[in-house]
Amino acid sequence: MMSHTETSLGAENTRTHNFITQIIDEDLASGKHKSVHTRFPPEPNGYLHIGHAKSICLNFGLAKEYQGLCNLRFDDTNPVKEDVEYVDSIKADVEWLGFKWEGEPRYASDYFDALYGYAVELIKKGLAYVDELSPDEMREYRGTLTEPGKNSPYRDRTIEENLALFEKMKNGEFAEGKASLRAKIDMASPFMVMREPVIYRIKFSSHHQTGDKWCIYPMYDFTHCISDAIERITHSICTLEFQDNRRLYDWVLENISIERPLPHQYEFSRLNLEGTLTSKRKLLKLVNDEIVDGWNDPRMPTISGLRRRGYTPASLREFCRRIGVTKQDNVVEYSALEACIREDLNENAPRAMAVIDPVRVVIENFESEAVLTAPNHPNRPELGERQLPFTKELYIDRADFREEANKQYKRLVLGKEVRLRNAYVIKAERVEKDANGEITTIFCTYDPETLGKNPADGRKVKGVIHWVSAVNNHPAEFRLYDRLFTVPNPGAEDDIESVLNPNSLVIKQGFVEQSLANAEAEKGYQFEREGYFCADSKDSRPEHLVFNLTVSLKEGF
């Protein structure tokens, strides 16, 4: 596993070096290409996840680095699973990450007429045929990794027959599954992808871009390479599972009349992040079964989920930079992702105080009300100061008080002193409990001479705890998020529900300081001694503040 022993954020603009940049450098030096043109080609059948962020940063990053172009293209060849909701979310995610595509977004469906023409060209060259094997029969004829496939009985139809049948497919004269157009290559090929794959199938489904114009749709492997060539993509970059598909990519382009030079496909290792799931099918099941609160649930590995959790674009870009681009599959520790957001927020997030599990404190010798000031960031004076109302009654966190404690406990103990953050030293004098023995109130005294300085008599007060006024505050809901799964590789589990973490969300009710009344959604704060939080973009509002835990203050805290 890759650890996160890295330098802090800020290396975004340094020159990257990997096997792809080496290829590009050679291509530009040799004159093979005069410029760089990449693309990010998601299928709009789900929300983008952290793995897509790596691909986005790579493709858009290369275009930026080489002063080239990067297209956003939707590979929308399966109308059954696709939706405009996903199109819109993908555009929003790419822009939020800080990237802008070349021109308007493109769609593979923009090229359906051209793709149909290229399919006809293959038929005329004797390189494609209409097959009427059922899907089950086709699987049976395909063979195995150790046995060659068998030719379809429909393989030797004449060009004229195939042209007429393909026209019938286009006109809706075949039912779904009753006919398909296949590439005519080699059923004995050692590469399964080359055993005469289907390149067009019938689907009587309305398409989100083309409506009901088509009832035949091209397959991904046929569409993708031609779309790259139409758009004059120079370097078509995808993940390693498409390595064998490159043979079909090249075969299609070499056998049609399309402008040269042809694009070339390069593969890199996909992101495998410890403890997360990136299968769209399994993520969709979590959403549909209401195990999570939609695609943007803060526990989801989606870009929109990470955004709602409080991750920043800079932290995700930095994470992608650190993990790099290789051809070797590896698993990245989740702590590497957390380190990036923790460093970002430590440097940039304003500080505030929040009491998540409150217990009441009464300062018996404090009769007035004071307004104290505190810096918004200890190392960033330009971020200014905030006012903290200090009142007779306060809230502190229940975990910050004990009636008895050993010397290692540096918080408030009965009969002993502690400093309140940005305020005075107080001493716990006595407690009040309810019928169940639960402490309801801690009665204290304060030392008025200790605001911003140590006690005059030299006594040592070692602990510091945070607090919120019990009078001037805002009630808040705190959503304490943890990992969604209890195992490092949930994708390998047949039943993902069996490895769900029952404590992936714990909800607490407490209070935040007055300055957070209008906390901006998704803006990160360090709640001192608690963690990094942000206001929830979906549920938080001034009359009902909701804060999401983004990440703990320290690794493994």
Swiss-Prot record:
UniProt motif ('HIGH' region) ranges: 42-52
Keywords: Aminoacyl-tRNA synthetase, ATP-binding, Cytoplasm, Ligase, Nucleotide-binding, Protein biosynthesis
Record flagged with keyword Lyase: no
Subunit structure: Monomer.
Family that this chain belongs to: Belongs to the class-I aminoacyl-tRNA synthetase family.
Cellular compartments annotated: Cytoplasm
Species for this entry: Haemophilus influenzae (strain ATCC 51907 / DSM 11121 / KW20 / Rd)
Enzyme type, top EC level: ligase
Reactions this protein catalyses: tRNA(Gln) + L-glutamine + ATP = L-glutaminyl-tRNA(Gln) + AMP + diphosphate
Binding site for L-glutamine: 75, 220
Pfam family, one: tRNA-synt_1c_C2
Chain location of the short sequence motif 'KMSKS' region per the record: 277-281
Gene, per the UniProt record: glnS
Name used for this protein in its record: Glutamine--tRNA ligase
Cross-referenced HAMAP family: Gln_tRNA_synth
GO cellular component: cytosol
